[in-house]
Amino acid sequence: MSGIYWGRANAWAAYTMACVGKFLPENYLYPQYMDISGALDEQLTALKGIQTKHGLWRTILDDSESYEEVSASCGISAAMVVKGNIFHKKYIQRALDGIIPQIASSGKVMNVSAGTAVMRDRDGYRKITRDWIQGWGQGLALAFFSELL
């Protein structure tokens, strides 16, 4: 892989790991789940530290020159909601405050990057278009909003 911390990949990983606990009865009895839960805790702790002042996460998480990417922000926030850690509450609220303005009156989730292959360098990720509606952006936004209910 490229070694670049791509926002949406981290979002999918975090949300998937968070959801495992919801669907695995008595998950605390499974040592493998403890590995997943521990990895998720470490990931979310790191992600909290790089949330932007607008409450979003960037397409390249650790790159201040890359744009804020809404599908990544929705997925990461959904993972925080599912995890249910009280210390995530302020980060979830910041994300919600940043995501809501990115939803057009038509329902389109804006600032979602197009399909993304593994890029050779950071500039490849920075240049991905955000002009069109993307199913994964709509889906991750719906996941986030439904988890808030």
Region roles according to the model:
Residues 56-64:
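Short linear capping/connector segments at secondary-structure termini
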Residues 36-55, 91-108:
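Long, well-ordered core segments of solenoidal/helical folds
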Residues 1-18:
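Loop-centered beta-sheet repeat module
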Residues 5-8, 31-35, 39, 68-71, ...:
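Alpha-helix N-cap and loop-to-helix initiation/capping positions
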Residues 63, 67-149:
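CBM-like carbohydrate-recognition segments
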Residues 7-11, 41, 135:
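Alpha-helix N-cap/helix-start motif at coil-to-helix transitions, marked by capping-box chemistry
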Residues 20-34, 83-87:
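Inter-helical turn/loop segments and adjacent helix faces that build the functional surface
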Residues 15, 19-22, 78, 143:
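Residue-level signature of alpha-solenoid helical repeat scaffolds
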